[in-house]
Amino acid sequence: MALTPIGFGAWAIGGGNWEFAWGAQDDDESISAIHRALDVGINWIDTAAIYGLGHSEEIVGKALKAASHKPFIFTKCSMRWHQDRSIYRSLKAGSLAEELEGSLRRLGVETIDLYQVHWPNPEEEIEEGWAQLERFREQGKVRWLGVSNFSVEQMKRAQAIAPITSLQPPYSMLRRAIEAEILPFTQAHGIGVIYYSPMVSGLLTGKMTRDRIATLPADDWRRRAAEFNEPRLSRNLKLVELLREIGDGHGVTPGVVAVAWTLHHPAVTAAIVGGRSAQQVEQMAGALDFRLTDEEYGRIVGFLGDHPA
């Protein structure tokens, strides 16, 4: 499976009115964003059943019906919802079977390219859940198996049952914890790393200001996020100005620089980059090719060292 350096992240296009929403979203704009991502050369889409409580998968499915060519489709399981829209987690075999059928139906596909355990919860069900995913693979319903948000020890438990194709962790210049143990482990075991939030959920795009953050919709989870609030926000906005300075020298946005910084690490495979409109996708298309020099990478590392969280 040869992936482009960035993939289209479909979290935000799930829309509003659920616990981890990004606010209201126009479905036609979402479909246009997906089509534009494919047009600029992005060859994979990452979504999850829980995004918009199924709505993100439905929108991806609609976009695929009218797409000029078909990308790799990745989705995730283990987070479910009740009729009152409250979320619960399960890795029970029967629950996962129901989830898979729902995802296949919403996406309008017969096979999912990469099926991932979204979170290792409940932890005592990891083995049961991973064994069930391996059965899905044997049945031809999924092609590859991945995990998301797993620790090294949790990956070892899964590996004892069936191989792991990929890990999906958070990774950005503000969230570097995986560099210590997780990336050395995945590199040693041939596990791909497709990571989320390289731009810290939009914070490093260059579009976020204090005023914009203050007026985020009430159902936008970022209003509660530590990086979007003091005491971290001031440091983060200064970091964006450094990214802007570097990007201006190459004609790219701060967001493209932020993604390029993460892609500089030799143990990562590709970055998940969200887009809520065709225009946003076009602004990020430069991340397919742009790379930082070692000197530019070091300038950012130096700033982070001088301005700890």
Which residues make up each language-model segment?
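Beta/alpha (TIM)-barrel catalytic core signal, keyed to glycine-rich beta->alpha loops juxtaposed to Asp/Glu
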Residues: P120-H307
